[in-house]
Amino acid sequence: MKKNKNYVDLKDQPVPEGQHLLEVDDLKMYFHTEDGVVRAVDGVSYTLDRGETLGVVGESGSGKSVTAMTIMGLISMPPGKIEGGDVRYRGRSILEMTEEEMQHIRGNDIAMIFQDPMTSLNPVYKIGRQVGEGLRLHRGYSKQEALKRATELLDLVGIPEPEKRVNEYPHQFSGGMRQRVMIAMALACDPDILIADEPTTALDVTIQAQIIELMQEMQEKNGNAIIMITHDLGVVADMADKIMVMYAGRPVEFGTAEEIFYESRHPYTWGLIRSIPEQAIEEKKPLTPIHGNPPSLMNLPEGCVFSPRCPYATDKCRKQRPERVVTESGHYSACHYSGDPEFLTNAPETSRTRKDSKKGGEA
C-alpha cells in the first residue's frame, strides 16, 4: 500500500519540546464586507494535547465554528482575513501553510464532523465510497482496499450490517446513522485532532447520548484530541477536560470542566448553566433564559460585549472592555468583577456549593 509520493505526514513528527499538539494564540479572523467589518473571531487562545477534550460553548454567532473552520483552512479569503494571532499544529504554523499542504492536513491530521450530515454527505455517491475517499487520497488505498476498510469503520461505529450498508446511499440512513457515518469518515485516517461541530444538534436525546458515548470510546481507543463545539453546556458536562465559553467572537471564560461548572466567574457562563434543565431541577427553580439577543459583530457595544444583556452590568461594564482575570490554575474570565468574592455569590447554586459537598463526601 503506497502513500501519495508528495504525502507529508506531520503525525510522524514529534511535538517540539515545550509545545502542545495544537496551539491557538490570540487568533483574530475578520470578514470585510460592503456593510462593514465582522469581527467573527477576536482574540481566541487555547492549547490542546492528545487524549484531551476541549468544549467550545456559546450561542449562534459566537465564533465557535469560524474558529474551527480557520484551523481547517476552510475560510474564503477574501472576504475573510486573518487580522492577528497564529495556529500551530505540532509546532508548525497552519496559517503559513500552502493549500497543497493543507490538503494533506485535512482529514488526515485534523478531521471535522460537520453539523448537518445530510448536507455534508453527497446524495449521489454510496456511503462506502465517501467513507473510503480519505483513505485513497491520504493513504494510497486501492478502491477495493478502501471499501474493505470503510466496511470495518462502519462496524466500528456501530452501524449494523456494514457489508450491506456500505453499498447504500445517504437517504437510506436515519439521522443518527448518518452522524455515525460522519464519525467513521473523520476517523478513517486516525487523525490527531477531531473537531466535532454541533454533532448532536439535530438528534433526539437518546441518540445524542449514543453519539457522545461513541466519540468517547473512539478517543479512549485511539488517543485523539477532540474539540467539541456546542451551544449546550450540558452536552460537554461529562465529556470535556476543559471548556472555553465564547460570546460575540471573544472567549469570556476558560478553565477545566470542574472550574467552569462549579467555580464559574462570568455572568454569561452563569446564564448558560441556568439554561440547563438539570440545573434548574437541582435548584428547584424555573429555567432562566438569557434575555435579549447577541450583538451585531459589525457594531459591538462599547465596553463589555455582554453588558447589554447582563443583569449585573454597571457603568464601568458599559464603558470599559474588561481584561481577563486569571487564577493560579489558568482559569480566566473577562469580567471586571470576577475577582470580587461578594459578586461571585451571584453564581448558580451548584457553583457555590460543589466544593463543600465534595469535601463532605470525602470526609
Identify what each model region corresponds to:
Residues 10, 14-20, 160-164, 256-358:
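Short catalytic/signature loops enriched in Gly
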Residues 32, 86-104, 142, 213, ...:
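ABC ATPase NBD Q-loop/coupling interface
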Residues 59, 195-199, 203-285:
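P-loop NTP-binding/switch modules centered on Walker-like glycine-rich loops
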Residues 90-93, 144-164:
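Conserved ABC ATPase "signature" region
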Residues 94-111, 137, 259-264, 295-301:
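ABC ATPase NBD coupling module
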Residues 188-192:
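A short, proline-enriched helix->beta-strand linker immediately N-terminal to the Walker B motif
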